Amino acid sequence: MSDKEMNVESFNLDHTKVKAPYVRLAGIKTGDHGDAIHKYDLRICQPNKAHMEMPALHSLEHLMAELSRNHTDKMLDISPMGCQTGFYVTLINHDDYDDVLDLIDKTLNDVLVAKEVPACNEMQCGWAASHSLEGAQALARDLLAKRNEWNQVFA
């Protein structure tokens, strides 16, 4: 790892020292009018050891993006990481870490009882053929089983 500070926060994180699953505050940005954007790293798979398969990841993204908004109006975005090991969860004006954990917990429990993947069609999705409700539910189930570990980022 370079000693030089990188512009991208996650590039400065030593991925060999973290222990998934976890939820960590990755950054806070304050807007010109005082709004605070909180970005959380929701790591599901151990970096460089495992990754989510695309259909399951894609469906979990759709489900969490839709269902999380049933629990908060502070959600801005849930974005998958390119490495396929987790998601970025971005909220506005919401800095209560324990509440964020509860929000993720409630959302994942909603995923477990979902009957379909929202917006899983060619009109609403750019790769509608790449989805797996069962895969997303398996990821949610595994993540919830380790709920007590979410606040432990480093091994």
Curated annotation (Swiss-Prot):
Keywords for the protein's UniProt record, in alphabetical order: Autoinducer synthesis, Iron, Lyase, Metal-binding, Quorum sensing
Oligomeric form and interacting partners: Homodimer.
InterPro entries documented for this protein: LuxS_sf, Metalloenz_LuxS/M16, S-ribosylhomocysteinase
PANTHER family for the chain: S-RIBOSYLHOMOCYSTEINE LYASE (PTHR35799:SF1)
Superkingdom assignment: Bacteria
UniProt cofactor note: Binds 1 Fe cation per subunit.
Known role: Involved in the synthesis of autoinducer 2 (AI-2) which is secreted by bacteria and is used to communicate both the cell density and the metabolic potential of the environment. The regulation of gene expression in response to changes in cell density is called quorum sensing. Catalyzes the transformation of S-ribosylhomocysteine (RHC) to homocysteine (HC) and 4,5-dihydroxy-2,3-pentadione (DPD).
Gene for this chain: luxS
Claim: Transferase is one of the keywords in the record: no
Protein's UniProt keywords contain Iron: yes
HAMAP family the record matches: LuxS (MF_00091)
Top-level enzyme category: lyase
Entry-linked Pfam families: LuxS (PF02664)
Reactions accelerated catalytically: S-(5-deoxy-D-ribos-5-yl)-L-homocysteine = (S)-4,5-dihydroxypentane-2,3-dione + L-homocysteine
Protein name according to UniProt: S-ribosylhomocysteine lyase
Similarity remark: Belongs to the LuxS family.
NCBIfam families: PRK02260.1-4
EC number, UniProt record: 4.4.1.21
A molecular-function term among this protein's GO annotations: S-ribosylhomocysteine lyase activity
GO aspect biological process, one term: quorum sensing
Cofactor(s) needed by this chain: Fe cation
Positions of Fe cation binding: 58, 62, 125
